[in-house]
């Protein structure tokens, strides 16, 4: 019997060997000694006896035995060899009494390499053992900025508090989100009961997930587990979920899992879509314009928040433009979590066809509700999300900020210009850099001092600017109704009273009108294709963003700005075309290439004439952390 099973294991090994070879991959076990020869190691840590997930044991420590095993740890030596005899004896012992002696191995970058016990691992994997007991030594590499290295150090922080090694995530920030969804603080030390409870949930989820997706599901189980928890967080009362409930919830989100498996393909619509052409039968059968009921869900109120004030102006404009055809309702001061869920459910109960959630913080709740209610159109005000069940919308500001930079550069006399930014989120870096490029185009020696209002107060920043003779400052572009201020847009702060020179205008009314028109004219249904997430990112050419230049700006400078604005709106110029330089060197050298919308939105570098950096996570205020958690650029340091 053991000989027959060895031959089965041998065939599995030969198939694995052949597959790896045909794919141009190394067809034997990985050797840790060889990997470490190219790695800076800073420490070793004894982890003691651990339960190691079998799938995470990928190699051997030394090169001596590597050719005896295929990459799946199945044997490659013929069944007459001494190796085969020892393997069969170990196999018989396992069937009779089990393998009790732990292997000795090293853990490096979340993978395990065997020092003693290769045949034990081979037998246990052949028998389908989900885990192997091992005495583990962790090898810790030098910390770097490489994404894989940063992700590993995030895992180390997670392991330090949880002692959990079977959850291996692939995205930066994932472990922080996981802890949040499990209901744990980042520095909370897990108890044995905590570990048992999470393990139980994970095992139940894994069973349901693999029943649906097979033994090789669309994405790794750990990543799917995190996606599941993001939509269905743990019950704070620790009520155990039944497999039937997990299955029902998993089926609702399956399209989102498939989308992630494809690499989260998304499409950014930079211009409103035209209505699809209709033939005679379409006109004859058309029921006419549909009456729409639309909900706006805000996290603050328009009296205290410039952001919400702008959206409320857009909502009122919408009702005015579609009298008798559109009804809107507004929800203010809605908190994340249960209150948001109740609010969205209430909007759906009131027969809303469209729901706008006006902050990136509501993205997760929007997705959760959209999955449960596919007939309702839910849009979140954020940029470049990768979810098929909802769509996102945002104003494209960087082109207008470039024009503001032109004015700042032209008027700057001492080479010092200030820039106040708020959230280090996707799209914001492009605004900063476009402004800096505008400055450089007309004043190559000027520099921009970058400051963050979510780290320091606006008043403190302005005082520092004045003390350092930074007289021209790009301030935030919105005004709070209850706290009006002239510090918006490009401002000259040299005198006692601020002098406004330019302003970038968010025209939310135009944006909402065009979004509603895409629903009414059929462009919504014709846009995009199955399996692609859609994001609306409209700017000056769509009338969603406007740029105002004060008469105080010299006439020739205004003419230059008007010319460049026309070129941008006609598609004849992009601030991010040709050679581009960051603080670290050249970003793009091709004179004939422009950055794509995706590259602009996900920009991670600052222009070479910017003095400053992205803020440290711990320096951000709590409001900013909540936004950055969802839409932040991924090189914000912990």
Named regions from a protein language model:
Residues 522-638:
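Segments of small-molecule ligand-sensing domains
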Residues 393-415, 505-525:
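Hydrophobic alpha-helical segments within soluble ligand-binding/sensing domains
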Residues 97-113, 119-151:
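A short, basic-hydrophobic beta/loop patch
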Residues 351-360, 379-381, 469-479, 498-506, ...:
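Periplasmic-binding protein-like
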Residues 1-116, 126, 171-184, 214-276:
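Short, charged/polar connector segments at secondary-structure boundaries
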Residues 315, 403-443, 530-552:
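An alpha-beta-alpha
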Residues 293-313, 318, 331-337, 425-429:
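Extracytoplasmic "Venus flytrap"
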Residues 371-394:
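Flexible loop/hinge segments that line or gate small-molecule binding clefts
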């Amino acid at each position: 019997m053991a000989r027959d099973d060895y031959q089965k294991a041998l065939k599995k090994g030969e198939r694995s060997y052949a597959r790896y070879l045909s794919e141009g991959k190394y067809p034997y076990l990985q050797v840790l000694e060889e990997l470490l020869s190219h790695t800076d190691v800073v420490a070793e840590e004894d982890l003691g006896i651990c339960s190691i997930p079998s799938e995470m044991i990928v190699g051997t420590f030394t090169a001596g035995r590597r050719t005896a095993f295929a990459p799946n740890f199945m044997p490659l030596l013929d069944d007459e060899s001494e190796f085969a005899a020892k393997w069969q004896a170990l196999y018989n012992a396992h069937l009779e009494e089990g393998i009790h002696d732990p292997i000795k191995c090293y853990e490096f970058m979340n993978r395990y390499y065997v020092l003693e016990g290769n045949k034990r691992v081979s037998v246990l994997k052949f028998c389908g053992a989900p885990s192997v007991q091992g005495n583990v030594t962790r090898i810790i590499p030098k910390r770097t900025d490489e994404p894989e290295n940063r992700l590993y150090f995030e895992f180390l922080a997670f392991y330090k508090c949880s002692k959990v090694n079977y959850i291996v995530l692939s995205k930066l920030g994932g472990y922080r989100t996981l802890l949040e969804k499990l209901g744990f603080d980042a520095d909370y030390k897990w108890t044995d009961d905590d570990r048992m409870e999470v393990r139980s949930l994970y095992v139940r989820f894994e069973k349901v997930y693999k029943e649906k997706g097979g033994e090789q599901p669309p994405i790794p189980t750990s990543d799917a587990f995190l996606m599941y928890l993001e939509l269905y967080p743990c019950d704070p009362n620790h009520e155990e979920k039944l497999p039937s409930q997990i299955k029902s919830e998993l089926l609702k989100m399956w399209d989102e899992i498939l989308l992630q498996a494809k690499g989260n393909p998304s499409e950014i619509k930079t211009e409103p879509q035209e209505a699809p052409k209709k033939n005679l039968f379409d006109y004859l059968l058309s029921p006419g314009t549909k009456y729409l009921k639309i909900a706006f869900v805000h996290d603050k109120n328009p009296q205290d928040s410039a952001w919400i004030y702008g959206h409320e102006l857009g909502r009122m404009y919408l009702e005015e433009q579609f009298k008798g055809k559109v009804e809107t309702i507004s929800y203010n001061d809605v908190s994340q979590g249960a209150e948001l869920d109740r609010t969205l459910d209430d909007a759906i109960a009131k027969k809303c066809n469209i729901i706008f959630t006006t902050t990136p913080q509501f993205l997760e709740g929007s997705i959760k509700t959209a999955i449960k209610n596919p007939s309702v159109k839910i849009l979140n005000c954020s940029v470049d999300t990768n979810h098929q069940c909802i769509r996102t919308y945002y104003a494209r500001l960087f082109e207008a900020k470039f024009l503001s930079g032109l004015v700042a550069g032209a008027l700057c006399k001492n080479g010092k210009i200030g820039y106040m930014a708020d959230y280090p989120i996707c799209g914001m870096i492009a605004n900063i850099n476009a402004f800096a490029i505008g400055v450089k185009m007309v004043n190559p020696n000027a520099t921009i001092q970058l400051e963050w209002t979510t780290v320091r107060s606006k008043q403190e920043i302005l005082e520092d600017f004045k003390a350092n003779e930074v007289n021209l400052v790009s301030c935030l572009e919105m005004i709070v109704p209850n706290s009006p201020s002239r510090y918006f847009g490009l401002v000259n702060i040299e005198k006692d009273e601020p002098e406004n020179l330019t302003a970038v205008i968010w025209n939310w009314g135009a944006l909402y009108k065009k979004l509603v028109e895409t629903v009414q004219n059929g462009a919504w249904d014709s846009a995009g294709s199955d399996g692609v997430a859609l994001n609306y990112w409209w700017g000056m050419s769509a009338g969603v963003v406007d740029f105002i230049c004060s008469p105080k700006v010299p006439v020739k400078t205004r003419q230059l700005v008007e010319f460049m604005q026309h070129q941008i709106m006609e598609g004849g110029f992009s601030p991010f075309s040709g050679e581009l330089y960051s603080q670290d060197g050249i970003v793009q050298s091709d004179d004939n290439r422009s950055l794509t919308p995706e590259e602009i939105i996900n920009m991670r570098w600052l222009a070479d004439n910017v003095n400053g950096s992205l803020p440290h996570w711990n320096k951000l205020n709590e409001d900013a952390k909540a936004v950055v958690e969802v839409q932040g650029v991924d090189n914000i340091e912990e």
